[in-house]
């Protein structure tokens, strides 16, 4: 059995330390107040049994709480007082030096919490450690100085989650849609160097990757680009190649048809080269965040401005999917699934029906998804229904990174605008805690819910105020050179924070457990569903109320909870104990999702969750868990057709693994060993994570650096929907 120290390091449970701590308190009380040896042993053994029953590594603080409770149960109140006083004195000492232990533990790779915090960061790498060191300082400043103490305490208690506190000390925003079109067409500046409009497709791709890296180093969230913005440069290259061919074949008896054939062949090679640049640059670049850029590539045919551009865009999309299907080579030279870029493919009338013009691209996308987990799918049809601007027009556009969606916006010229906009940040409410705090009383639930929402509102205002007054100079690539704006040097970014240009997100998590506790049923049950929808509606109403009062675009957001699921679960267990079906797991359910272990088919799940996506305008994604579908692409195509007609944004989860020890490329299994969940090759028994390639959908993005115990349990509990 293991425990987690305050520094984050994971060590073996040692009952002798509990006994020694009790005896220290026992030694300074009078004889009449002392505990007997049998009582001390009983307390220590009870704590050990409690820790064993939790099926996870307990923290030192949780164990000390158990010791206090045990001393109280023995009616040794004077001993308890001494024990509590000692804890308090030690906590005061720690406050005088708030970050040293955590920083030292992560440098020495002893910090298990950090190791499993982000499934796309490797904390043993020096550059990642530097980011984590800066993050510890930022979190310390945030907790002690920058943030309202009530919000800090609520964050620590798991009542809410103040996202990305490790970046809050700086004036940084969350995620965005990069205006690549503006930067490529009008030029940009990177590291003080002016970059003019590119003269070929491959150069445009190279510049795009440099922009991606610069943007990623200037923010903490994901970013998205559209292949549509690269499509015009295909024809630029076509014309350039055509001129070269004419010069090469001047005076030769070569037909125009043959010349055009040669032009298109060379053009295809350039497209291959350009797309390869994006794929390999993205997975090999290291940003100042200590990781590859969290980048999403949007593939939307109807975004093209004319038929020629659409045809050229189709060529780029085909090559992007083809290369992703192939994968990238790991250190053993084996083709594996990369985490990035995340790919999103838009389903539309031109590509979703058999016989449609670009149906072949959708079939290729389905083949890729079955092997590599991407692309994910946006339905143009449903998005047109959900995202209606003030002109009454439906809009289709990419999320910012994983799932965060902008709300519809019309600029001063009356045109809808999405690229160049961003999200200010996220604060997530723990819906399960609201329900448990109410004790199941509906009236109390709504009162507590409103109080907690206002606390989240205060936390969101803190995020907004942290950005307010920020000069454009803090990130020229974003604010001055086109990614998000063309502001003057020294000009504050304030005008971009209001009027709907940017959004700010009220996240929510654990709707399933919340509804289950309040109604006794899953929210998929017809008797419980109205309550679930009313919870969603209340968050929408509050966001609209705040938006109207402040001219800031608040919107509900289905939080992915990558590692926070474990934090929330532990906090709930500490506050309310183990409640069957509610707090008996080391995770809580993401956003509005159906519980991972619930028996439901793919089509019913997607149809059910579509109602909740509509009520989550700030961000949402649904998934279905499927077996290996590489030999059943017809079923994948059926699912894609269903997605197009029924839900705005969805993905298919499968497995893509490889054992470097024995070459096994089937599913790497999750097993339990000494109370801890491990990944194990079923063929050779390898459990060395450094020699396993495991790709799983964590929460929208693909994770490849493994997960904490809570998220790992959630992955293990997932049932198939097909």
Model-flagged regions — what are they?
Residues 89-500, 521, 525-687, 693:
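Conserved catalytic cores of very large enzyme subunits
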Residues 5-10, 29-36, 53, 410, ...:
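A ubiquitous short alpha-helical element
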Residues 271-275, 279, 516-517, 711-717:
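Metallocofactor- and cofactor-centric catalytic cores in central/energy metabolism, strongly enriched
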Residues 23, 457, 461, 512-516:
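Amphipathic, well-packed alpha-helical segments that form the structural scaffold of globular domains
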Residues 1-107, 716-721:
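Charged, amphipathic alpha-helical regulatory modules used
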């Amino acid at each position: 059995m293991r425990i987690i120290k305050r520094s984050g390091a994971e060590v073996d449970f040692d009952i002798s330390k509990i006994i020694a701590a009790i005896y220290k308190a026992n030694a300074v009380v009078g004889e009449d107040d002392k505990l007997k040896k049998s009582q001390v042993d009983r307390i220590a053994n009870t704590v050990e049994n409690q820790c064993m029953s939790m099926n996870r590594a307990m923290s030192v603080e949780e164990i000390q709480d158990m010791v206090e409770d045990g001393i109280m149960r023995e009616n040794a109140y004077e001993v308890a007082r001494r024990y509590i006083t000692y804890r308090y004195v030690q906590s005061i000492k720690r406050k005088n030096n708030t970050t040293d232990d955590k920083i030292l533990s992560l440098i020495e790779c002893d910090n298990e919490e950090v190791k499993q915090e982000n499934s796309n960061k490797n904390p043993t790498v020096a550059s990642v450690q530097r980011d984590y060191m800066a993050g510890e300082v930022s979190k310390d400043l945030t907790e002690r100085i920058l943030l309202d103490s009530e919000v800090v305490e609520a964050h620590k208690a798991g009542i809410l989650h103040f996202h990305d506190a490790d970046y809050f000390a700086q004036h940084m925003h969350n995620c965005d849609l990069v205006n690549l079109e503006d930067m490529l067409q009008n030029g940009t500046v990177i590291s003080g160097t002016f970059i003019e409009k590119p003269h070929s497709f491959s150069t445009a791709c190279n510049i795009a990757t440099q922009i991606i890296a610069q943007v990623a180093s200037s923010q903490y969230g994901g970013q998205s680009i559209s292949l549509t913005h690269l499509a015009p440069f295909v024809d630029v290259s076509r014309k350039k190649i055509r001129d070269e061919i004419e010069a090469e074949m001047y005076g030769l008896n070569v037909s125009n048809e043959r010349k055009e054939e040669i032009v298109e062949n060379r053009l295809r090679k350039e497209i291959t080269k350009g797309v390869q640049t994006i794929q390999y640059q993205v997975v090999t670049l290291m940003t100042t965040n200590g990781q590859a850029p969290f980048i999403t590539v949007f593939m939307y045919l109807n975004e093209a401005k004319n038929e020629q551009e659409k045809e050229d865009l189709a060529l780029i999309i085909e090559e992007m999917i083809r290369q992703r299907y192939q994968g990238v080579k790991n250190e053993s030279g084996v083709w594996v699934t990369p985490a990035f870029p995340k790919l999103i493919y838009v389903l539309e009338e031109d590509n979703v029906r058999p016989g449609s013009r670009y149906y072949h691209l959708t079939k290729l996308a389905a083949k890729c998804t079955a092997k590599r987990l991407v692309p994910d799918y946006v339905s143009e049809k449903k998005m047109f229904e959900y995202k209606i601007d003030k002109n009454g027009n439906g809009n289709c556009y990419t999320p910012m990174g994983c799932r965060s969606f902008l709300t519809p916006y019309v600029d001063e010229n009356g045109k809808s605008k999405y690229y160049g906009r961003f999200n200010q940040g996220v604060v997530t409410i723990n819906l399960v805690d609201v329900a448990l705090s109410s004790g199941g009383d509906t009236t109390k639930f709504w009162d507590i819910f409103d109080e907690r929402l206002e606390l989240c509102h205060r936390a969101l205002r803190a995020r907004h105020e942290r950005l307010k007054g920020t000069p454009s100079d803090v990130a020229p690539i974003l604010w001055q050179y086109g990614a998000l704006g063309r502001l003057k040097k020294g000009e504050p970014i304030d005008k971009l924070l209001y009027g709907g240009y940017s959004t700010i997100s009220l996240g929510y998590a654990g709707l399933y457990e919340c509804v289950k506790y309040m109604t006794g049923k899953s929210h998929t049950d017809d008797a419980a569903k109205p309550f679930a929808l009313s919870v969603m509606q209340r968050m929408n109403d509050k966001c609209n109320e705040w938006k109207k009062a402040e001219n800031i675009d608040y919107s509900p957001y289905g939080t992915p909870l990558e590692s926070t699921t474990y934090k929330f679960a532990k906090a709930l267990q500490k506050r309310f104990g183990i409640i069957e079906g509610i707090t008996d797991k080391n995770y809580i359910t993401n956003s509005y999702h159906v519980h991972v272990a619930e028996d439901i088919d793919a089509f019913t799940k997607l149809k059910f969750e579509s109602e909740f996506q509509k009520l989550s305008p700030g961000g949402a994604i649904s998934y279905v868990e499927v077996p290996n579908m590489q030999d059943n692409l017809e079923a994948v195509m059926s699912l894609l057709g269903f997605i197009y007609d029924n839900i705005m944004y969805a993905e298919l989860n499968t497995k893509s693994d490889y054992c470097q020890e024995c070459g096994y490329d089937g599913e790497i299994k999750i097993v339990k060993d000494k109370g801890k969940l491990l990944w194990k090759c079923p063929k050779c028994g390898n459990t060395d994570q450094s020699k396993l390639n495991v790709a799983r959908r964590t929460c929208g993005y693909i994770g490849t650096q493994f997960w904490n115990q809570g998220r790992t349990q959630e992955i293990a509990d997932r049932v198939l929907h097909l």
